[in-house]
Structures are given as structure tokens and as C-alpha cells.
Amino acid sequence: MSETHFGFEKVDETEKAGKVAGVFHSVASKYDVMNDLMSGGMHRLWKMFTIAQANVRPGHKVLDIAGGTGDLAKAFAKQAGPTGQVWLTDINESMLRVGRDRLLDKGVVTPVALCDAEHIPFPDNYFDLVTVAFGLRNMTHKDAALAEMRRVVKPGGKVMVLEFSKVWKPLEKAYDVYSFQVLPWLGQKVAGDAASYRYLAESIRMHPDQTSLVRLMEQVGLEKVEYFNLTAGVVALHVGRKY
């Protein structure tokens, strides 16, 4: 049997998806509140930067993978307009339900679907843009997921990955204290779940750093891959193109 990591813990590959699902079933109802608290609201700026770089136009088709509570999908739906198509997808039903309801509350009607990023249920060369924000690190086979994203994007289209990354070295010690002490404490106080936020910190440390993710995206056939460090590398936006 093959092993992978669930945070720092080694688990069988067949177990990881279920463990990750448990985390997000637990945190779904408090997800947005915790994002604001954990990042000091910075996650909104990171997403705004991603939206600007995406450059979605009227009529575009966009796939938002692991779209959670729908921040990106909401913006893309407004930009793509009635002639476009924006799909909000997530592998976690609890997160998808929260995202769907949140979009409806904002008056945004867009299709939603349960979707495993390693087996995307769309044809080749279908979307102008595929995005995944804060989801790739939770996937068991990141290379397979990225290959699927490349498959469904059109020639000339983009795959964009917004994800926690390798922080600037002088900040590492302070960031570790925050990640492994403050985050679980916040998770317990606000969401009643310290363990899920301990996993969050661990999963960030196990995720490929900026240059490693560039190589991984290139290995699946994406080209002209570049990245933008945000907030001293706490987060990075990677952009790959298909030709």
C-alpha cells in the first residue's frame, strides 16, 4: 500500500481523502469567520489579486476547484456575465452547501457540483480558466489533479493555484509560533475544533514550496509557469498556461 501525508501524519493513500473530508465537514460553518480571524482579513486581498490576474471576460468559462464558500466564483460569475459559465465545485458536500447558499444570498446563480479534482467530469479543452484556492495542498495526488486541470483548460487558457507557501526565512520562527500555537487556540475558541487547525498548519508545511510547485506544474505540461509571493510568501499565486 502507498502512503501519503495527512499533515505530519503518514497515512495510507486510501485514507487521506476521508480524513480531509472530516476536517472540512467540521469547519464548514465557521470557515469564513476563521479565514478572517486567521489572516487578519488578508485572504480577501490575496483573492482580489487572484481575481485581477485571472482577467475573466464576458463569455468566459471558468472552473473553480475546491471553491469552498464561493469567494472566487462570485467574482468570476459577475465578470463572465450571462454569456459566460462559472462552475463552483468542491469535493466536500458541507463546504459546497455553504458556498451555494452564500452565492444565492448574494443573488449569484451559478452551477455547483461535487467534484474530485483528480477526476474532473468535464471534457478536454472546455474552460478558459481553472482556479484552485487553498485546496491543492489537501489533495492526495497533486500531480494528477494538476494534469486534470490542464486537460480541461483550452489552449491559450490558464490554470491558477492560490495556496499557502514558504514564508520569507527571517519570519519563519514567528510564523511557526503563530501556526502551531495561535491557530489551534483560535480554532478551539471559535470553531470548537483545535485539531482541524493543527492539521491546517501541518498541511502548509508539507506542501511544495514555490519553486517545487513550479516544477510540478511544468511536469504535467503547463507552460510559462510563474508565481507571485504575497505577504512575504505566506501565500503564493502560481499561474501556468496551456498552448
From Swiss-Prot:
Record's keyword annotation contains Transferase: yes
EC number: 2.1.1.163, 2.1.1.201
Pfam families per UniProt: Ubie_methyltran
Domain of life, source organism: Bacteria
Record's keyword terms, sorted: Menaquinone biosynthesis, Methyltransferase, S-adenosyl-L-methionine, Transferase, Ubiquinone biosynthesis
Residues at which S-adenosyl-L-methionine binds: T69, D90, D116, A117
Role, per record: Methyltransferase required for the conversion of demethylmenaquinol (DMKH2) to menaquinol (MKH2) and the conversion of 2-polyprenyl-6-methoxy-1,4-benzoquinol (DDMQH2) to 2-polyprenyl-3-methyl-6-methoxy-1,4-benzoquinol (DMQH2).
Name listed for the protein in its UniProt record: Ubiquinone/menaquinone biosynthesis C-methyltransferase UbiE
Species annotation: Cupriavidus pinatubonensis (strain JMP 134 / LMG 1197)
